[in-house]
Amino acid sequence: MFLLPVVVVGVLAGFLLGGRLGRLADVRLRAPWLFYLAIALQMLAFPSLVMPWQAAEGIATALSVGSYVCLVSVFLLNVRLRGLAIAGGGMLLNLAAILTNGGHMPALPSAMRDAGLSFSGIHNNSVADASPNLAWFVDRWAAPSWVPFGNVFSAGDVLIAIGVVVTIAAAMGARLPLPARRATGTV
């Protein structure tokens, strides 16, 4: 899933709902290093064409699963931020699909065809599979052709996108039409 358009939508939603971009600097994440570690693990597992290495399949799978564990941990540690529980739920759906399908995210051939993709076997963290385990959690839909860097996506990706948009807009101080969490404790 390519997150840049989702971040842009989150910032636009924040502005439209009265938020300010400067408020994003006030957000304090717990264990942000886990987020950066997850990105590094993904880059090691699935290097771009400009990087001078190729990870062996077993190592790439272990690094990829490790990156998901780091990301889920970041979400759990920061669940107090509005919207992050939604994104974390999406990560858990994706992780469940990956773990029950041999360490790779299955993509339905029909979705790949609709996205203009064609590969057999394993490509980065995806594997073409017409009958995967947890079929509703796998990459089953294709982004429209007009979406930059369009690809296939899953129910987990949808939840991640919604959660990221809500988190960014809320962090900007937007007036969200969602119930605020009540403080607990004695007065």
Provide a role label for each language-model segment.
Residues L12-G22, V74-R82, V166-R175:
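Structural signal for the C-terminal ends of transmembrane alpha-helices
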Residues S67-N101:
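Interfacial segments of alpha-helical transmembrane regions
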Residues M1-S67:
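Transmembrane alpha-helical insertion/packing segments
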Residues W53-A56, R82-A87, H104-D114:
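A cytosolic-side transmembrane-helix exit/cap motif
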Residues I59-G66, G150-I162:
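Membrane-interface loop-to-helix entry segments
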Residues A180-V187:
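Short, charged juxtamembrane terminal tails flanking transmembrane helices
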Residues A107-V152:
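Extracytosolic (periplasmic/ER-lumenal) interhelical loops and adjacent juxtamembrane/interface segments
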